């Protein structure tokens, strides 16, 4: 597929400076394109007492900005034209400063010290500013999504499963983006930089006002791929001979659930790979267990 959207209603808030004081109307100027492919295959087989069905579907999709209003003076490496619609704009990093010598011998934010993020000087001007941010190809929207439906029946017993997954997506794990109402998580606190832990995984302790660590940086991006058991149901139908004496045509018992199992890298951060939850307002996937009986009279 190749789906082009044009005449998208947007304001010229980027190219018109704020100091004009203008409240701009929406114009039909935006344009994007989504390219990709959908593919599916299904196989089934039936015998006298056993039958099964196995399927696989996959979608690869890549969005691209054709035109978006952008400021004329932003660096080329920050422009969204030609990139994914929701591509990340981040500071690139070399990890964490471990020594004062590393701070002294590199461009850095004012007040930088060992334990802070080591931000790259992208424009090579000897200082770290907003111009050093880079728009990267990755986004929170996966380029690959797939599903594997499976069903099998043997006599009166059946099982129905749906596996889902995604790949080629990045999520921001920076918890302080949620503001001061959110306490730092234990994973960030326990492995933070200290004098006794100079080889820590994460920077020094910081809050939501920290200008050196509480920033959108590639250091905080993680692979949001997952493989999940989206739904499962096991059922059993009672024999008709047993039910006929009670005037019942059919009785089916079932048990199952949704969101039962997942393989992903986001559990350690208490985040859902399907939810880009940097603000804390998105509710994660709900796990549901259910049992019941269907009766036909």
Model feature map: region roles:
Residues 25-29, 44, 134-138, 219-224, ...:
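Outer-membrane beta-barrel proteins
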Residues 26-29, 74-88, 136-147, 151, ...:
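C-terminal extracellular loops and terminal segments
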Residues 27-33, 46-140, 265:
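Conserved small-residue
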Residues 112, 166-252, 257:
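Extracytoplasmic gating/loop element in the C-terminal half of outer-membrane beta-barrel translocons
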